């Protein structure tokens, strides 16, 4: 093979009248008899090749035999296109290469789908032929953007005194949250390693070892139910520091994100980011990861309706609940009763019993509950509605109200076109509760993880009322997605012991699960804290995708399997025998895991 002159996508006017050698894939071929055009594709783009008897008769014959996705090498001379043939949509659109030599480096079967953006093909097929899917320009762009982000992260953290340290991939199973992926030990029959759900404990130990500032682009593994922005194996930008306050860690993180946004998107984000307490986020936006690209704040009308004749509202308040509302500007004419009822059915999944609504006119109100509120003037004023608006109400327990209205706010924000899809709005959510109640397993769990330091003024509550304590934790949110989270950690063994006790750990169980950390805390650990940012989610948001599978080279599908390699699949009996493992076919995985610990977010 000859040495490549440049990438096909880089052949521009500066190469005119120069001899070039190019290599790549045949995107498409067009034959006009004595003239053949081939679009040659590589990672940088596409350039048009021209074959003619005038240039070389043999090259024309070979060009006539090639098909899509053949791998070829060509030599030729770059020429300017005729004005009427210029393609302004292509970087190389004002030139073409007159080819005199072509070599077929490899043939290709007809692909199961066209290698082009926007192709209509099932997700399963794209994953089965991922190596073909990754040839598409938008997929290449996603992976290059990911690499660009990682490069920017490395540069910033290296320049700010952080040291890149690898932590173990084979480690001990600890009750950190989701189910562990277990790896059986052949050397120790019946014993297992676990793949890390995060480097959390190891990075704390590195602070105890005196490294002061650690980072890692860390691979993490969690055996949990999947959704669009989750994968069983994922990557996070992991940081930990010693002797810094939460505010100082947030400042460093803002600097990191500002550099990435500048380097990758050419955007200078406004610093510092907005800060909102967890309680305000839930009250105003119905979410602990609020989308601040639009306003539409939730309004509390509990006091106004507690004595109303509408028993649903009055009863909710009397039973310790709330009545809250959102206003949909211009929604009165846009949404019919049928459309509103469809949302009423949807919010029942959050525990809401129903959705009340009013339409505002110039001098009155209408709707199923209008008769209970006269002309509705006080109610309209309280929620800040105007003529033509639609007001939605939910009455229930605080969490149910927040979850339901938070969903409705986001849904209608998109539907009404209130969200600038090109905007990036970062914010911090701070002052979290230390614990939250998990209705699914009917017990208290950490809002983040069991190594989070309570607020200084709340440490004493670990002895008396731990569930009232707040934490030195903070989440960074982008456009309604949790981008990352962190906290100041517990560096005192006594406080860590109280935290585990509040979670129901006996001293013996705490020592068995976290003994190595508890023992280490006896040897002079510094105050420390950190943060982790989900790299996959960050790339997804910066590339405008809606699924992290689009920004991971070889992801799993929604069933945690990989169609390309067929993983996971049964292994040979001999391998199982070496490990002392017997496979049972009658296991119900859900029942097997009932009562599992859930200690993290």
UniProtKB/Swiss-Prot annotation:
Catalysed reactions listed for this entry: tRNA(Asp) + L-aspartate + ATP = L-aspartyl-tRNA(Asp) + AMP + diphosphate
- Which GO CC annotations does the UniProt entry carry? cytoplasm
An example Gene Ontology biological process: aspartyl-tRNA aminoacylation
Q: Could you tell me which residues belong to the region Aspartate?
A: 200-203
Its Enzyme Commission number(s) read 6.1.1.12
Cite a single GO MF annotation: nucleic acid binding
Return the InterPro entries for the record: Aa-tRNA-synt_II (IPR004364), aa-tRNA-synth_II (IPR006195), aa-tRNA-synth_II/BPL/LPL (IPR045864), Asp-tRNA-ligase_1 (IPR004524), Asp-tRNA-ligase_1_N (IPR047089), Asp/Asn-tRNA-synth_IIb (IPR002312), AspRS_core (IPR047090), GAD-like_sf (IPR004115)
> Which purpose does this protein serve, as stated in its record?
Catalyzes the attachment of L-aspartate to tRNA(Asp) in a two-step reaction: L-aspartate is first activated by ATP to form Asp-AMP and then transferred to the acceptor end of tRNA(Asp).
User: NCBIfam families from the entry?
Assistant: aspS_bact, PRK00476.1
**Family, similarity comment:** Belongs to the class-II aminoacyl-tRNA synthetase family. Type 1 subfamily.
What protein name does the entry list?
Answer: Aspartate--tRNA ligase
- Which species? Lacticaseibacillus casei (strain BL23)
Task: Give me the gene this protein comes from.
Answer: aspS
């Amino acid at each position: 093979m000859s040495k490549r002159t440049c990438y096909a996508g880089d052949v521009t006017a500066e190469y005119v009248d120069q001899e070039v050698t190019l290599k790549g894939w045949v995107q498409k071929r067009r034959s006009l008899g004595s003239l053949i055009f081939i679009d040659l594709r590589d990672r940088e783009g596409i350039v048009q090749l021209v074959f003619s008897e005038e240039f070389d008769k043999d090259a024309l014959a070979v060009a006539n035999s090639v098909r899509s996705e053949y791998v070829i090498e060509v030599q030729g001379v770059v020429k300017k296109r005729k004005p009427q043939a210029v393609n302004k949509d292509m970087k190389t659109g004002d030139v073409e290469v007159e080819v005199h030599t072509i070599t077929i480096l490899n043939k290709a079967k007809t692909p199961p789908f066209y290698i082009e953006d926007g192709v209509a093909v099932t997700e399963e097929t794209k994953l089965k032929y991922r190596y073909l899917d990754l040839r598409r320009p938008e997929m290449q762009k996603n992976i290059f953007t990911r690499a660009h982000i990682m490069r920017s992260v490395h540069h910033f953290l290296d320049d700010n005194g952080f040291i890149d340290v690898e932590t173990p991939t084979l480690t001990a199973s600890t009750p950190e949250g989701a189910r562990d992926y277990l790896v059986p030990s052949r050397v120790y029959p019946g014993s297992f390693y676990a793949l890390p759900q995060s480097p959390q404990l190891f990075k704390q130990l590195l602070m105890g070892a005196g490294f002061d500032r650690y980072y890692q682009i860390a691979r993490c593994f969690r055996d949990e139910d999947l959704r669009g922005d989750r994968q069983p194996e994922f990557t996070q930008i992991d940081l930990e520091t010693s002797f810094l306050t939460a505010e100082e860690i947030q400042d460093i993180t803002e600097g990191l994100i500002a550099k990435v946004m500048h380097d990758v998107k050419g955007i200078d984000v406004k610093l510092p980011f907005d800060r909102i307490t967890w309680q305000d986020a839930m009250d105003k936006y119905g979410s602990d990861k609020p989308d601040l690209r639009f306003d539409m704040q939730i309004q509390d009308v509990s006091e106004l309706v507690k004595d109303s004749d509408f028993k649903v509202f009055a009863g909710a308040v009397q039973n310790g609940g709330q009545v809250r509302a959102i206003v949909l500007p211009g929604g009165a004419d846009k949404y019919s009763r049928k459309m509103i009822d469809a949302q009423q059915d949807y919010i029942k999944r959050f525990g809401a019993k129903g959705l009340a609504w009013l339409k505002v006119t110039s001098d009155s109100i209408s709707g199923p509950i209008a008769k209970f509120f006269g002309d509705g003037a006080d109610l309209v004023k309280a929620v800040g509605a105007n003529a033509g608006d639609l007001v939605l109400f939910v009455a229930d327990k605080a969490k149910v109200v927040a979850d339901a209205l938070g969903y409705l706010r986001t849904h209608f924000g998109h539907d009404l076109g209130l969200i600038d899809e090109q905007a990036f709005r970062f914010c911090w959510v701070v002052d979290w509760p230390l614990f939250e109640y998990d209705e699914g397993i009917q017990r208290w769990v950490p809002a983040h993880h069991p190594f989070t330091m309570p607020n200084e003024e709340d440490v004493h509550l670990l002895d008396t009322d731990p569930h009232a304590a707040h934490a030195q934790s903070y989440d960074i949110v982008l456009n309604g997605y949790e981008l990352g989270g962190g906290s100041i950690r517990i560096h005192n063994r006594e406080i860590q012991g109280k935290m585990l006790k509040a979670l129901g750990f006996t001293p013996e169980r705490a020592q068995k699960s976290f003994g190595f950390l508890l023992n280490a805390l006896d040897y002079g650990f510094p105050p420390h804290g950190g943060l982790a940012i989900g790299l996959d989610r960050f790339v997804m948001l910066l590339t405008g995708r809606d699924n992290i599978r689009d920004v991971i080279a070889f992801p799993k599908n929604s069933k945690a399997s990989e169609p390309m390699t067929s993983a996971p699949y049964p292994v040979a009996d001999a391998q199982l025998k070496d490990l002392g493992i017997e496979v049972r076919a009658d296991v119900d995985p859900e029942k097997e895991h009932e009562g599992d610990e859930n200690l993290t977010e």
